[in-house]
Amino acid sequence: MPFLQRPGVRLAIRYGVALALVLIFVFPIYWLFMISFKTPGEIFAFPPKWYAQHFQFGNYYGLFKDGDAKTVLNSLILAGVSTIIAMILGTMAAYSLVRFKTGGENLAVWIISQRMMPPIAIVFPIFLLYVFFGWVDSYHGLIILYTAFSLPYVIWMMRGYIEDIPLELEESALVDGWTRWQVLWRVVFPMARSGLFATAVFTFVFAWNDFLFALVLTRTEVITYTVQVTHYFGGQSNFWAKIAAMSVLGTLPVFITVAFLQRFLVRGISMGAVKG
């Protein structure tokens, strides 16, 4: 038997490749985490220091003391509220498209096509509109914008998940005297739960990582963490420790969300892949 065809060798190669891929994806996160605790001397040391010799918690303390950490809370409010609104409206719209054929067969394609428009092409008209209404640097302004941009994606995704739910189950519930709202809450939502969570996670991440709209439409009160990070880049020098610390704070909510919803997320993505 050839050497590479032996079961033990093939298994070792698989584990080796898997380990290499894990290191490639995990190392940048580890390095970012270490930089957030390093002194400037350790950050620019050569050869590089693979870990912080003296952990500088002051990098994080400074963010909270100066109020910069509030930008993470701003991002959480904007992303969280817009995700909830988009999921409620988008799921109901998707249900209407599937069960009542609202707008015909081409409406869903038209809706998702709106999401393909590049944000940079419309950011200036939106800015002028927000100046007119006085929505610049406001929570409700960005929440409305994020919701509007998330709705096409939510409708498209939830349309596919709802189509997989047998119509007979809903008809049986209606025959038993349930209202359409009861059917939604007791039949459709529980059966599409994995799809709901998967869609919500990606919707949340879109709003959480937004930079362009937050940069143009905020000033001082509603700055998000993505915009705040750019304030640490200067013409003469960059505050790399603050950049790393703010980046760590900005990634924690996403990591925690994905960790708690991992089971539903994987199942929801798998359902979509099987359907496709």
Task: List each language-model region with its residue ranges.
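A hydrophobic, multi-pass inner-membrane permease signature
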Residues: 1-276
